[in-house]
């Protein structure tokens, strides 16, 4: 049996950089405002994994109303989510992550993001795709107000 999950996350720019995205520090003059480290890519990916096993979303498991998660490392949250996936008898087939941002430029960091995600999800890098796009200066991402990310995962019964 296979299961598919979809995740989405958005964070607004603010404060000092860098931007943490895909588990990688990307130099930028601003960071992202969030309760945790604000890693929109890993948040969307975590939501996709939780959705695939019908386990809600990261807000349910790591609420921003709980100081325990303040400044949390999203890579650790992702690992915890993947532990839940494995407990349900599934493993990752593949993941596809789309970062939507006018800035900063993501291309130089994509390979490092793929490596970090593959490591955290205990899979081969060939099972992880990360790509970035702009909105051609349209909308809040085009105005450089924040970053959005979508993620899709395929899980396979072990």
From Swiss-Prot:
Pathway connected to this protein: Isoprenoid biosynthesis; isopentenyl diphosphate biosynthesis via DXP pathway; isopentenyl diphosphate from 1-deoxy-D-xylulose 5-phosphate: step 4/6
Cofactor(s), names only, from the UniProt record: a divalent metal cation
Residues engaged in binding 4-CDP-2-C-methyl-D-erythritol 2-phosphate: 9-11, 35-36, 57-59, 62-66, 101-107, 133-136, 140, 143
Listed SUPFAM superfamilies: IpsF-like
InterPro entries attached to this UniProt entry: MECDP_synthase (IPR003526), MECDP_synthase_CS (IPR020555), MECDP_synthase_sf (IPR036571)
Residue(s) at site: Transition state stabilizer: 35, 134
UniProt-recorded name of the protein: 2-C-methyl-D-erythritol 2,4-cyclodiphosphate synthase
Organism expressing this protein natively: Vibrio vulnificus (strain YJ016)
């Amino acid at each position: 049996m296979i299961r598919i999950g979809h995740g989405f996350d958005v964070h607004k720019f603010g404060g000092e950089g860098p931007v943490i995205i895909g588990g990688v520090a990307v130099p930028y003059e601003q960071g992202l405002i969030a309760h945790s480290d604000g890693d929109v890519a890993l948040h969307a990916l975590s939501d996709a994994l939780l959705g695939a096993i019908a386990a809600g979303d990261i807000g349910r498991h790591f609420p921003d109303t709980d100081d325990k998660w303040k400044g949390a490392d999203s890579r650790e949250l992702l690992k915890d989510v993947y532990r839940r996936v494995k407990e349900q008898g599934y493993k990752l087939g593949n993941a596809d992550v789309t970062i939507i941002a006018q800035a900063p430029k993501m291309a130089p960091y994509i390979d490092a993001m793929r490596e970090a995600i593959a490591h955290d999800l205990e899979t081969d890098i060939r099972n992880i795709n990360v790509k970035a796009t702009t909105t051609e200066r349209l909308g809040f991402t085009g105005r450089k107000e924040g970053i959005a990310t979508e993620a899709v995962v395929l899980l396979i019964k072990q």
